[in-house]
Amino acid sequence: MIRYTHIFLLLSLLGCSSALQAAQTEFFDTTFGDFSEELQTAKEEQKSGIFVFFEMDECPFCHRMKTSILNQPDVISYFKKHFKIFQVDIEGDVEMTDFDGSVTTQKDFAFKKHRVRATPVLAFFDLDGKLVARYTGATSSKEEFMLLGDYVVNGHYASTSFTRFKRQQRQSQ
């Protein structure tokens, strides 16, 4: 016999699933896996760089980011304006091309090339494919994630750490 609690649980899970799918379809850009080509597109579109969201399927922190931060309209708008945005599954065997044109897998791109060991890792690359900022773990809030975007877009990474930048921003308010 199906109970109302089972129906509620099923509907709740479906709701989370659709919120997750919405975040994935709106926030992330579609790619054929050639990041060297994506760099060229980012230059042509006058973006600040490329944002890579390193993730794992069963990662609760990745899930929280997708369902509570990456699905927010102002977040989507800001990041789409300034970055090409891609997901990389750190366990993925999908073949891809790195920024320098080397063929690899998502797993090797994450582990060997960028030493990703925990998820999520929020990685920002400049228009030459050079890693300029990296944040390991989920941000504590949408505001912190937006501040991280501002930190990269306005080039603060060149002169200070994100932790120091956050502290300066709090003191100036």
Task: Please tell me what each predicted stretch does.
Residues 30-32, 75-104:
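Thiol-based oxidoreductase modules, predominantly thioredoxin-like and allied folds used
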Residues 109-158:
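Non-catalytic, surface beta->alpha helical segment in thiol-disulfide oxidoreductase systems
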Residues 1-6:
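Positively charged n-region of N-terminal signal peptides that target proteins for export
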Residues 45-60:
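Short active-site neighborhood of thiol/selenol oxidoreductases, capturing the structured segment around
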Residues 23-46, 158-173:
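N-terminal leader/targeting and pre-domain segments
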Residues 7-17:
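Bacterial N-terminal signal peptides
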Residues 63-80:
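Typically the conserved alpha-helix immediately C-terminal to a functionally engaged Cys/Sec
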Residues 18-22:
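Sec/Tat signal peptide C-region and signal peptidase I cleavage site
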